[in-house]
């Protein structure tokens, strides 16, 4: 029997990946997943992956009518957590619903919960990126795994901050318009400020993890579904070469330095790399930095990185479970276990 039992509340883009990631670990298990709609994902969860399925009380009849087997209600499993052996809920519900679930379910039941980056930072005691502040989440009741963009920036900037003295950071975020399965979002023929205000919210979100970094961000949305891209400018307070930066990234966890010149010149080709590596759902958990973009000029570092928005936060959720339950106090040991189970690599197999 696994050491920790986990309920994934919300089985969509992130939730289904977190469920599979938890299921792959030796020291934790999936107690169940929660769905609100009796769709193909719910059917796959039960019939293909064998996950116990829980649903809201007011949706039970819909699942019965659809012929999808359920194990009970989400209200019952959370509010009777001890009876079910539930240790942690990973809340992967849409923005704002997690905070409501905390108030109506998790706090009432005294159950630990992890939230995603769409929630406000105030929902949790800690905003979390394993490489940056794992120890802060040890024993915490509520943790927020920050957004895909924030996670990516924390990984690369955190690596740089460990090695070099940094000044101001400026980032332009080029956001994908929607995930591949989403048909109700856009734009499909425009570039849109998102948000139109500068600075954007991404910089302050990075500071919830790395409070002493000086960062300003701006963001736009473009008509693509595959990945985000960041153009990063970092003022340096010491002499650093491009090779120093490449070495730092290559030594870091969950960051790949990839060669633009070997047919990896776009986000489409990076996603194809994920497919060719045999990754499930072509997931790229790692942040991919183009080697040729890394340049230091007049005391300023520039680089570009690509972010698979569906996947990069998944390892963080697993590490957060270990930290909160104190399964593992050493961040490196937790990340070793997570990465081994998921096939996360610290350098591309190129």
Curated annotation (Swiss-Prot):
Binding sites annotated in the UniProt record for D-glyceraldehyde 3-phosphate: 147-149, 202-203
Coiled-coil region list: none
Region (Disordered), start-end ranges: 327-350
Keyword NAD: yes
EC number(s) on file: 1.2.1.59
Alphabetical list of CDD domains matching this protein: GAPDH_II_C, GAPDH_II_N
GO cellular component: cytoplasm
Protein name as it appears in the record: Glyceraldehyde-3-phosphate dehydrogenase
Organism from which the protein derives: Methanopyrus kandleri (strain AV19 / DSM 6324 / JCM 9639 / NBRC 100938)
Lineage of origin: Archaea, Methanobacteriati, Methanobacteriota, Methanomada group, Methanopyri
